[in-house]
UniProtKB/Swiss-Prot annotation:
It comes from the Eukaryota. GO terms for cellular component: collagen trimer; medial layer of collagen and cuticulin-based cuticle extracellular matrix; nucleus. This is Cuticle collagen bli-1. The keyword Signal applies. It comes from Caenorhabditis elegans. The keyword ATP-binding does not apply.
Length: 948
């Protein structure tokens, strides 16, 4: 108990320590994660600041040469932009100059940057000062939502196309080029201040915000409705202006900005549009080509690729929501167009003006046409970054490289601009041959001393030494402590032991008193009929008077009577005339029919059916007359009528026909009468005119048999019938024939089951079990037993066949008839009697089934039993060893008798000739003991111990 408590306490402490360690480690991990997150946030903010200020640092670090190259590249890019959308036919130079004079002060921004003469890319403009609380963000770091799902209104005076990009019409227009007399803003190479403080050239009237399109005062156009100043207010499509279609490049000016392109347009090989000479992207102006340089076509085309131009891109023109490119005209933002239905949302997508519509008049146009001299207000908050732009066009092809010289020879010419050509390092050459071995080096320092090896395994134990002398006895130890008091407990009984050896059988007990008389057995098998008794004395002579003629005696001879059936003759003269008319042709009705003889089979033995006929086809004599085929039911009825028998029927005896339903007549039996004692009750039954079926054993009596047929045995004869009763009442045509009831056994009554006619294959003939003899009592044929005693028969009579006793007919055990012998398989409801119909050839099979080969346990038990029997016999003979003799053992009398005979020794192979029922290589224990112990041992020991 103490150890278990100690182990439990240690386990609890260990679990507590593990839990504390897990909590501490979790806290440390969470702290590290929080520190890492805070450092990542700081680094991200720092990265944003660096990314937002990187362009300013790059601008300050540019050299004049790099600035010139940037100007050239930017000018070439701007040459692909469309012409100014604000130069219309109604716009005059005077209006532009007047507007420029009034908006000179507004041309410059507060930061001092001139948006008019800006030649750099839009991203190179200096940013406006932002409030310190507004964080800087780089473009593209926070992508805005698409224009169709954006919650913010787009900038004033602009819209987005399907790619989330502002069209070219809403961008800052390219300002007209200045005359050549005007100096360039970046002419001085070392003047960095001129980048932000250029000389103010003649200004034109452009708005302050470069992203807001310029809207000069034009009296012929209405002004677009303005939005509130808050650019971050949510956009509502209900108050959205008429959105113009997106602008597509539709031509422009050459590099000077004033003259149309001098070089011919290329790649204009497609099908022209309906509104112009060709597609708008085919009219993109190009700069004059540089000598020795190939022109690169614009990227927004779908022209076939040029195999000679390896730098030509294949990016298609961004289509509109309609799926095709439209040829547009210069867009006037002051013109009002109705909202179209072609876009996915009202106010977005390509909107076309409806033909025949007029711009609406606005009364505020007169007020808004006045010049605005109000000072510019403070800069608004920084807007959301725009969507990322399309990738830029590829740069021009580089200059042609210098001609290289031979290996080891410098190039003949030197270009001061390019300088020396820096060639990359080539691949390593092949490995050269190995050199000669060098001088051996000096000896190294001695190493440390090694670790000692491990000890070897202990050797095998040696041989035991000599036994020494015993030592002197030690001193007695101290008495031990008294033990604990014992506890009383009840032990569980152990398992039962193995059965002991069987003891010597005890002596026979005194004979018991006779038991009660047993009940009578069931009636046995119906035996053959007995012999006829002696004839009785003759009766008194009858009245000597002539008999009166019968009903039918006046017109035809009477037919022969039948021994099976008897019908009441109830035909009148009218019926007879009908029968005469219905007779077939060629049939002599007046001629008396000769009865057809019938061949019957005479047998001297009884078959298994105990009275049934042999199923054989009847053999007719060739001279027998065959009746014509049946024509109607009347003719058949005539055939059925048979004459009465000549002699009276014998007294009624129970025949086998009354025991089996298949032996009944072919007609359905009437239901049993209410009064079972009266067996002569007649029941009217309508006769079915159908010829009776013949049986397989003998021909059915149908009117063609006579006196000359062979006489059958008495037990084969049909059931006797009463005398026919003829009705002498008035004849009636509708009165049916009546059938005489058959007298049945008074105890059995009528069998309600239908008779079964066996028309299938005939039964196999089996030998009879009894011979026909004169004695009324029969003795069973002695035969050897096929079952051990006490098995397969009632226990009340175990060996009834051994004494040769006879059985009466009433005491014979009933055996149900079976079609075929199925070995020893007994039916469920069959009584437990020995099957005496088993043939001799099944003897070996029965032996194998009931006497199997014993196992080892049985052999051991039998051997012990044999030894005990020998010991008992030796004691009875005065201790002498029994001698094996072939003398059969005599039955031992009870010890209470006066004379005692010596019992001969038991032989191992002893079997009485009268008691031997089988032969087996391994005899059972019941065969090695006297007969007086056989049944007792067999019943109590064999079945209870070995079989269970």
């Amino acid at each position: 108990m103490v150890k278990s408590y100690t182990l439990a306490g240690l386990a609890a402490i260990a679990c507590l320590l593990l839990a504390i360690g897990a909590v501490i480690s979790t806290v440390y991990i969470l702290n590290d994660i929080s520190d890492f997150y805070s450092e990542a946030q700081e680094e991200l903010v720092e990265f944003k600041d660096i990314a937002n200020n990187i362009w300013e640092e790059m601008v300050f670090e540019l050299t004049p040469e790099e600035m010139r190259e940037a100007e050239d590249n930017d000018r070439e890019k701007r040459s692909y932009e469309p012409e100014g959308p604000y130069q219309s036919e109604t716009t005059t130079p005077s209006t532009t100059t007047s507007t420029a004079a009034t908006t000179t002060e507004a041309a410059e921004d507060e930061s001092g940057y001139d948006f008019v003469n800006d030649n750099g890319p839009p991203s190179s403009r200096p940013r406006k000062p932002e409030p310190p609380t507004m964080p800087r963000t780089i473009q593209g770091f926070r992508a805005p939502p698409p224009a169709a799902t954006s919650t913010y209104r787009p900038p004033h005076g602009s819209n987005y196309d399907n790619y989330g990009r502002e069209p070219a019409s809403s961008r800052r227009p390219y300002p007209p080029q200045q005359p050549p007399s005007t100096s360039a803003p970046h002419s001085s190479p070392n003047n960095r201040t001129s980048l932000y403080n250029p000389q103010p050239p003649p200004k034109t009237g452009y708005p302050t915000n470069p992203r807001v399109p310029y809207n000069p005062p034009q009296p012929n156009y209405t002004r677009q409705p303005t939005y509130p100043e808050d650019n971050r207010a949510p956009y509502k499509p209900t108050r959205s202006p008429n959105t113009p279609p997106p602008r597509q490049p539709s031509g422009g000016y050459d590099s000077d900005g004033q003259t149309p392109p001098s070089s011919p347009r290329i790649y204009n090989t497609r099908r022209p549009n309906n509104h112009g000479p060709g597609y708008p992207e085919d009219q993109v102006p190009t700069a004059p080509p540089v000598p020795g340089q190939q022109r690169v076509p614009p990227t927004q085309t779908r022209n076939p690729p040029n195999p000679t131009n390896t730098r030509q891109p294949s990016r298609p023109v961004p289509p509109t929501s309609d799926g095709h490119i439209e040829a547009t005209t210069p867009y006037n933002p002051s013109a009002q167009y109705p909202t179209g239905k072609r876009g996915s949302h009202p106010g977005f997508g390509p909107q076309r003006p409806r033909p025949g519509t007029r711009p609406r008049g606005n009364p505020c146009d007169q007020c808004s046409a006045q010049p605005n001299h109000c000072p510019s207000g403070p800069p608004g908050p920084r807007g959301r970054p725009g969507p990322p732009g399309f990738p830029g066009q590829d740069g021009p092809r580089g200059l042609r490289g210098l001609n290289g010289g031979y290996s080891g020879v410098q190039p003949s010419s030197y270009d001061p601009v390019i300088g020396c050509v820096q060639c990359p390092i080539g691949p390593p050459g092949e490995r050269g041959p190995d050199g000669t071995p060098g001088v051996p080096g000096e000896d190294g320092i001695d190493g440390e001393q090694g670790v000692n090896g491990q000890d070897g395994q202990p050797g095998a134990p040696g041989a035991p030494g000599y036994h020494g002398m015993n030592g002197s006895p030690g001193t007695p130890g101290k008495p031990g402590l008294p033990g604990r008091n014992g506890q009383s407990c009840k032990s569980i009984p152990g398992p039962p032991g193995q059965p002991g050896v069987m003891g010597v059988p005890g002596r026979d007990g005194d004979p018991g008193t006779d038991g009660e008389h047993g009940q009578d057995g069931s009636p046995g098998i119906q035996g053959p009929p007995g012999r006829d008794g002696t004839s009785g004395p003759d009766g008194q002579p009858g009245v000597s008077a002539p008999g009166a003629p019968g009903t039918d005696g006046g017109y035809c001879p009477c037919p022969k009577r039948s021994s099976k059936f008897d019908f009441n003759d109830a035909y009148n003269d009218d019926e007879k005339r009908g029968l005469e008319e219905h007779r077939p042709r060629g049939y002599d009705s007046e001629r008396a029919e000769e009865p057809r003889p019938r061949q019957t089979v005479r047998t001297n033995t009884y078959d298994e059916n105990s009275g049934a006929e042999h199923q054989r086809r009847p053999n007719y004599e060739p001279s027998a007359e065959v009746a014509p085929p049946r024509q109607d039911r009347y003719e058949d009825e005539e055939r059925v009528r048979e004459p009465p028998p000549k002699r009276p029927p014998p007294p009624h005896r129970q025949t086998p026909h009354e025991l089996y339903p298949e032996e009944q007549p072919y007609v359905r039996r009437p239901p049993p009468p209410q009064n079972r004692g009266n067996y002569e009750v007649e029941r009217s039954r309508e006769y079915v005119p159908e010829a009776p079926r013949p049986r397989q054993g003998y021909e059915h009596s149908s009117g063609y048999g006579g006196d000359d047929r062979k006489e059958q045995p008495k037990y084969m004869e049909s059931r006797p019938v009463d005398e026919p009763r003829y009705e002498t009442d008035a004849p009636s045509r509708s009165r049916p024939l009546k059938k005489v009831e058959i007298i049945r056994h008074p105890e059995r009554g009528y069998d309600r089951r239908q008779p079964s006619y066996e028309d299938s294959k005939p039964r196999q003939e089996e030998p009879r079990r009894y011979e026909t003899e004169a004695e009324p009592r029969y003795e069973e044929v002695p035969r050897k037993e096929t079952h051990p005693p006490g098995f397969g028969r009632p226990k009340s009579e175990e060996n009834p066949r051994e004494t040769g006793r006879t059985y009466s007919e009433e005491a014979m055990p009933p055996v149900q008839q079976t079609e075929k012998y199925n070995g020893d398989k007994r039916k469920k409801n069959q009584p437990e009697y020995e099957d005496i119909s088993k043939p001799e050839e099944d003897k070996e099979r029965a032996m194998e089934k009931h006497h199997k080969k014993p196992n080892k346990f049985q052999e051991k038990q039998w051997e012990e039993h044999r030894k005990s029997q020998e010991l008992r016999n030796s004691r009875e003979h005065g201790g002498q060893v029994p001698v094996e003799t072939s003398v059969p053992m005599q039955q031992v009398k009870p010890e209470s008798s006066a004379e005692e005979k010596p019992v001969p020794p038991v032989h191992d192979n002893f079997q009485s000739s009268e008691k031997r029922a089988f032969s087996n290589e391994n005899p059972l224990p019941s065969e090695q003991i006297p007969y007086r112990r056989r049944n007792r041992f067999y019943r109590n020991h064999y079945y209870e111990k070995f079989l269970v």
